[in-house]
Regions:
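Transmembrane alpha-helices and adjacent helix-loop boundaries
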Residues: 1-178
Length: 178
């Protein structure tokens, strides 16, 4: 469908082409300026920094993930689909048993990078008064006046979480390898 394709392209282009921090600011500060939204049920969600950050992260990672999956599906050789059809396998079964497993395997390294980037991107949530790891670090610094020690610990925690994600993705890559 050309309309859906244009919408998907535009969504991906906008969210991959603008910084995550700008997206968080537009959702948290910008949408609150729209008078109509303040009188709808959406305001219950949009007035909270937690939900605004979640929405921004979801829209951002959704754009990158859609591009990762698009490129993964494009790596599937048409001959594999034709082989399934020649054996009398339905298109639905070909999709679930041939295309999806190949696309998952192809997309894992890039998707692992996206997860790590999103994990590190959570530090931007502190800019909208949300107490994430970076926000807590800033608070501790304001009471202890020891920025180096606090940021080294915060960086170590991020590094450990990245280590866990990286090793989980590597395990899945080995599990799904041929």
């Amino acid at each position: 469908n050309p309309i859906i394709n244009k919408f998907a392209y535009g969504y991906s282009y906008v969210f991959r082409g603008t910084p995550l921090l700008v997206q968080i600011f537009i959702i948290y500060y910008g949408l609150g300026q729209v008078e109509y939204l303040r009188s709808t049920v959406l305001w219950v969600i949009l007035k909270e920094p937690y939900w605004c950050a979640i929405i921004a992260f979801a829209l951002n990672t959704g754009a990158y993930t859609s591009e990762i999956l698009r490129s993964a599906f494009q790596t599937i050789k048409p001959g594999m689909i034709e082989a399934g059809k020649s054996l009398g396998i339905s298109s639905k079964i070909i999709f679930y048993k041939i295309q999806i497993p190949i696309a998952i395997r192809q997309s894992l390294p890039a998707y692992g990078n996206e997860i790590i980037l999103m994990l590190k991107g959570t530090s931007l949530a502190s800019t909208v008064t949300l107490m994430d790891l970076t926000g807590v670090a800033k608070y501790i610094i304001s009471t202890t006046f020891k920025p180096i020690e606090v940021f080294i610990v915060a960086g170590g925690i991020y590094l450990f979480m990245t280590f866990l994600v990286h090793n989980t993705i590597k395990y899945l890559e080995r599990k799904f390898s041929y």
